Swiss-Prot record:
Disorder this protein is connected to according to its UniProt record: Cystathioninuria: Autosomal recessive phenotype characterized by abnormal accumulation of plasma cystathionine, leading to increased urinary excretion.
Name by which UniProt lists this protein: Cystathionine gamma-lyase
Gene name in the database record: CTH
Effect listed in the UniProt record for changing Q240E: In CSTNU; strongly reduces catalytic activity and affinity for pyridoxal phosphate
Gene Ontology CC terms: cytoplasm; cytosol; extracellular exosome
Subcellular location: Cytoplasm
EC nos: 4.4.1.1, 4.4.1.2
Amino acid sequence: MQEKDASSQGFLPHFQHFATQAIHVGQDPEQWTSRAVVPPISLSTTFKQGAPGQHSGFEYSRSGNPTRNCLEKAVAALDGAKYCLAFASGLAATVTITHLLKAGDQIICMDDVYGGTNRYFRQVASEFGLKISFVDCSKIKLLEAAITPETKLVWIETPTNPTQKVIDIEGCAHIVHKHGDIILVVDNTFMSPYFQRPLALGADISMYSATKYMNGHSDVVMGLVSVNCESLHNRLRFLQNSLGAVPSPIDCYLCNRGLKTLHVRMEKHFKNGMAVAQFLESNPWVEKVIYPGLPSHPQHELVKRQCTGCTGMVTFYIKGTLQHAEIFLKNLKLFTLAESLGGFESLAELPAIMTHASVLKNDRDVLGISDTLIRLSVGLEDEEDLLEDLDQALKAAHPPSGSHS
C-alpha cells in the first residue's frame, strides 16, 4: 500500500509505513536477554549448542549472525520483500547471483552499467563459460531480440550509471518472464527502496551496493539482495554460506543504523539534487544535464510512473574539453573529487577516467561517457553552498574573456 504525498511532484506516492519499518522491523528488544533497544554487535564467530546438532538459530557466523539477521529483516521490509541477504560488497552480491548459473548459460546485461559490473561480466564471468551480451535494455525490442534459449539472467540498472537512462522494469519483466525461467535482476543502488521497489514491478531480484544510499555514511562496503521467491532465496542462502562473501557484524550494525534515517536523507538528496540539476541546466557553460527528475529527461514520464522521487545523482556535460572538466573538478571546494556515491557528503567525478575506466573506450564512446561527462553525487549540505561551489568552479573552467587564469 502507498500513502499520498502532496509534494510528490507527479511521482508515485511514497510507500506506506516506510519510516516506521526502517526504525522498527528486525529491531525488537525482546530478542535479546538484555532487552537492548539498539541491536548489539554480535562479534562471536561461533554459538553454543544445547546438544550436538541442536542450536538456537545460530551455529557459525558465516552461516548466520544475529546482527546481520536484524539488518536483513529490515531491508526486506523496506524493499517490500519476503527475504534479504547481506554480502561483503555489491560485487560480492553480483558474483553470488551469477553462481546461480552454469557454463553455457547467457547473461543479458544493460550496456550502460556500473564499471565494476561491466568488468566482472566481461573479464571474469565470461572466462568461466558464461555468455555475456550487453544490450540497451531501455529499448524493450532490443532486449527481446537478444533473448535465446540459453538466456538465464537479465541484469539491468535503472537509472543507469552514469548516463541515467531509465528502464521500464515492468516492461522488461513482462518480456523476460514470457520467455521462460529467466531471472530478472535490478540493481537498485541509484534509487534505494525509498524511491523505487523493483520487486513490486516484476523483478525477481532487487540488489544494492549498500555502500551507497542504504548505509549513507561512506563508512561501509556491503551488498544486499532482496527476493520474494522462496526457492530462489534458498538457493542464494546456500550460495551465501558456501561462497562465504558475508559482511562483518560491525558493518551490519552500521548499515542497520543508516537505514533509520534513510527516508529523511533521501528527501534531502532529492531536494538538493533537483536544485543542482536546475542550476546546471540554466548555466551557459553546461552542454547538457541528465537528471530523471527534470522534465527535460527523455524518460521523465516513465520515472514518474515507477518511482516515488529521485535521488542526488546528477550527470552533466561541461562545455569544452577534458581540460575544462579537469579544471572544474580541481576547483571544487565543497564537492570532493572522489569515487562512490550516496553518502551525506557531496562528491564529483569523471567517469571516463575514474569509475568507468575499465569499460572499453569504444563502448564508452557509444554510451556517451565522454571526457566532458561529469557525475555528481549531491549530498546533504545546504543548497546555497552547493550551488555557490558549482558556480565558482564553472567560472574557473570558463573564465570571462580578458581575465587571467
